[in-house]
């Protein structure tokens, strides 16, 4: 006995569209990393009273959390660039700050703060076959807030898009090389203490 099924016209249209969808090659993390045009800003500053100089950079990382290897490459390059420019200016005092779009549990953060990342980690960028690439920056860096408080802030980003659940986590950091002593940081609120948002307000 032959069974007959009635196929909904919408289902037929969906199947046709799916079959007609263009096939894209697998994404290459290195090409993705090179294709971003985020800019880093560097300056050498000198303390007027002591004459001590610092190399200071700020960077806004790509928001590519679905491509963790791309995030690691940009994090490592930002740290390496900052340290190398500082050294050119005759100082080993480097400061790197900005919106990194990585969380404290991410491999990019681990690489910056330990100068080490397991090659099997999903965040570790694998070089092309037959090539070599040292992803580790010249030295590890210290997160100022964790250095002083023993942990990162509860959050630096509190965002809500339409009907999605709010995203609350730490994405912004101030990193310094180990030779810089961090004495204090500005206090930041816990998410439970924030009742007067969103920021900026109409008056800011």
Briefly describe each language-model feature range.
Residues 1-62:
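Structured beta-strand-rich core segments of catalytic domains in phosphoester-bond hydrolases
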Residues 28, 44, 83-95, 101-204:
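Metal-dependent phosphoester-hydrolase catalytic domains
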